[in-house]
Amino acid sequence: MNIVCYGLQWGDEGKGKVTTYLSREFDYVVRYSGGSNAGHTVNYGEFKLVHHLVPSFDIRGNTKAYIANGVVVDLDVLIKEIEEIKKIGFDVYDRINISSLTHIVLPVHKMLDEKLEIAKGEKAVGTTKRGIGPAYADKVHRIGLRLVDLFDKETALEKLKFISKMYKNLYGIEWDDYEILFENFEKLSRIIVPPLEMKEELKNANVLFEGTQGVLLDIDMGSYPYVTGSYCNTTGVESGLGFPIKIDKRIGVFKAYVTRVGKGPFPTELFGEEAEKIRIAGREFGATTGRPRRCGWLDLPILRYAIETSGCDEMIMTKADILSGLEKVKVGIRYLSNGRKFEIPNDISMIDKVTVEYIEFNGWKNLEDDNFAKFVDFIERETGLKIAYISTGEKIDDIRKV
């Protein structure tokens, strides 16, 4: 069986924990998009890991991992992650493969990312400055460097010199320290494989595809221009993988409230003491940047939008425990714009111009409370989808089947 596990909001839904929990039943976990801008936190109890590039698979088991060519890879970050895992007693080099067609994030990409954010001023997107957008841009400009290019050092050096010249002439960015790149490549060369080799490997395997960010950050279907540089919707699986594959189920992960990092529209956003209470209780600070996340009430119109555009089959709810103890919990149920009501936005670009109609629930003391059961039932009715699992805490096994 092949399943996609992905985010239904603006990322940070708890996909890392959920994917790691589900991974035990699969032969492979495959990352198909994004880069080191992802920050998937996994709490094993005795230790905690933050995955930026290593797919979220249970390192204590037998599941293998694959980084497909839809991902852009910072070799330094990937090596450091693998080495960090090794330090706690798990050598995963023999359980990870990476596509030879994967594009590489270079130092010039990070420099340009920062320059662009500064140049945009108040219109800055609020990127992680990890060079993800510029790396994808070079891929589209057909000047990007792939892992396969590094097998021929002489040709790779020619390409690197050309890239350096372009960045110096166009942006005033200088970089010519190529040797570290080749050193990192040597460390990873034995795990690099052609996509068609992985096609054979995955043909008869049970595969869990791990989404990064969330549908609302997808380069096409997200809240553009406040989005990431990749296809993080379920539609990105096959393009990111490089070959067709049958998807049996799409499982969308959402938080019982909403957060987002950086700028962009956020119809149900909370401010002041209300927002800070949720932010502190939920530890809502970016795993990649450490930035405080913006917090707000659950937004059903935008959740329905994400469900429709991704073909979601069932959902997993996370962080409902964070709302335990609140006297009242609100849910945005529809948008109001120019005298009209919207259950789901036809055009996501409209959401910065709407007001929100809310419904209020009595709060719950814990997740066994009848008030919480009413909250869950309401969401299932309003979305038309079953909530298959509910996360009950921070650790991997703090999750229950509904």
UniProtKB/Swiss-Prot annotation:
Mg(2+) binds at residues 12, 39. The active site is at residues 12, 40. Signal peptide: none annotated. Pathway: Purine metabolism; AMP biosynthesis via de novo pathway; AMP from IMP: step 1/2. IMP binds at residues 12-15, 37-40, 128, 142, 213, 228, 291. Pfam families: Adenylsucc_synt. Gene3D superfamilies: Adenylosuccinate Synthetase, subunit A, domain 1, Adenylosuccinate Synthetase, subunit A, domain 2, Adenylosuccinate Synthetase, subunit A, domain 3. GO terms for molecular function: adenylosuccinate synthase activity; GTP binding; magnesium ion binding. Coiled coil: none annotated. It is an enzyme of class 6 (ligase). Homodimer. Plays an important role in the de novo pathway of purine nucleotide biosynthesis. Catalyzes the first committed step in the biosynthesis of AMP from IMP. Belongs to the adenylosuccinate synthetase family. This is Adenylosuccinate synthetase.
